[in-house]
């Protein structure tokens, strides 16, 4: 009898519409778009340009040492120096040699800083550029040695020097040998200064730890890119130590400018022109 027949039901997947919607979404290659960490806008990579600056809020994306070199130095003027120096893994830190090898292969760099000489609008200078894609540009024995040799070379050749900083601090895998580079580089900076030579530091995002507490803060003129994170200890560590809530803009370049730790904040698009002008003024003073 039809009255007692078992009813039949068709099961519908409640997530079907979501699954179909996801399936309909086109795959967009990551290299085509970037999301701005500041304003959260999705930006077409070509709109960022070679300076990698957000067109919506002027946020400065982090860039590699090679990208930095391309927008600052005159074309084909950079002569790299002090390559081939390698860490001996003084603490026998497990996995450290393998990590170094993998990072070198991925970045095409031999360490976290590029050192050499270049011209900027025709003005010759010694130049060092740190690269945060290389183990967060942490300062180990090789970084310290390359920077020290560059300062010594600049002192001998009577050259000004420009250093672009970007670092997470000392390299923990090298322990006290890493911390020693703070004193070593600072001494080299002092000898360069005693010779009456010109030193510019450009603080970029992020510049922290032992790098901030040594050569990064010793420039005759200290410039910074907008909104760069600059400090020694981390925000959370400081708040837990002093038991106070820090201002929202604490450790930002603008905060440091207002408190006298930075001489000027320069937009990335204007940095090449500003550096060339400073080098030119320094040269003119020398010739007086």
UniProtKB/Swiss-Prot annotation:
Membrane-spanning residues where? Answer: none
Ranges where the CoA carboxyltransferase N-terminal domain occurs: 32-288
GO terms for biological process, alphabetical: fatty acid biosynthetic process; malonyl-CoA biosynthetic process
Q: Quick check: keyword Cytoplasm in the entry?
A: yes
- The answer to whether keyword Zinc applies is yes
Kindly list the cofactors needed.
Zn(2+)
Quote the cofactor binding remark.
Answer: Binds 1 zinc ion per subunit.
Residue span of the signal peptide, if any?
A: none
Among PROSITE patterns, the record links this protein to: COA_CT_NTER
Give the GO molecular function terms: acetyl-CoA carboxylase activity; ATP binding; carboxyl- or carbamoyltransferase activity; zinc ion binding
Q: Which family does it belong to?
A: Belongs to the AccD/PCCB family.
What exactly does this protein do? Component of the acetyl coenzyme A carboxylase (ACC) complex. Biotin carboxylase (BC) catalyzes the carboxylation of biotin on its carrier protein (BCCP) and then the CO(2) group is transferred by the transcarboxylase to acetyl-CoA to form malonyl-CoA.
Indicate what this protein is called per its UniProt record. Acetyl-coenzyme A carboxylase carboxyl transferase subunit beta
Organism expressing this protein natively: Lactococcus lactis subsp. cremoris (strain MG1363)
Name the gene that codes for it.
accD
């Amino acid at each position: 009898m039809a009255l007692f027949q078992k009813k039949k039901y068709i099961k519908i997947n409640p997530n079907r519409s979501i699954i179909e919607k996801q399936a309909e979404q086109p795959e967009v290659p990551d290299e085509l778009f970037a999301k701005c960490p500041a304003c959260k806008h999705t930006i077409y990579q070509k709109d960022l340009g070679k300076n990698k600056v957000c067109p919506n809020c002027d946020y400065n994306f982090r860039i590699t040492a090679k990208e930095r070199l391309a927008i600052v130095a005159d074309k084909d003027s950079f002569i790299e120096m002090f390559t081939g120096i390698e860490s001996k893994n003084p603490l026998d830190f497990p996995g450290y040699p393998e990590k170094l090898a993998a990072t070198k292969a991925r970045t095409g760099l031999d360490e976290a800083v590029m050192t050499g000489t270049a011209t900027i609008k025709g003005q010759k200078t010694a130049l060092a550029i740190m690269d945060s894609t290389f183990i967060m540009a942490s300062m180990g024995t090789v970084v310290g040695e390359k920077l020290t040799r560059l300062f010594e070379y600049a002192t001998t050749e009577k050259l000004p020097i420009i250093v672009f900083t970007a670092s997470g601090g000392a390299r923990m895998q090298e322990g006290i040998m890493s911390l020693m580079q703070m004193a070593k580089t600072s001494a080299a900076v002092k000898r360069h200064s005693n010779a009456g030579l010109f030193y510019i530091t450009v603080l970029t995002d992020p510049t922290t730890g032992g790098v901030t507490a040594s050569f990064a803060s010793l420039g005759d003129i200290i410039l910074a890119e907008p909104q760069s994170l600059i400090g020694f200890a981390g925000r959370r560590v400081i708040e837990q130590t002093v038991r106070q809530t820090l201002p929202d803009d604490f450790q930002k370049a603008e905060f440091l400018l207002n408190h006298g730790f930075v001489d000027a904040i320069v937009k990335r698009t204007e940095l090449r022109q500003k550096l060339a002008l400073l080098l030119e003024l320094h040269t003119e003073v020398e010739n007086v």
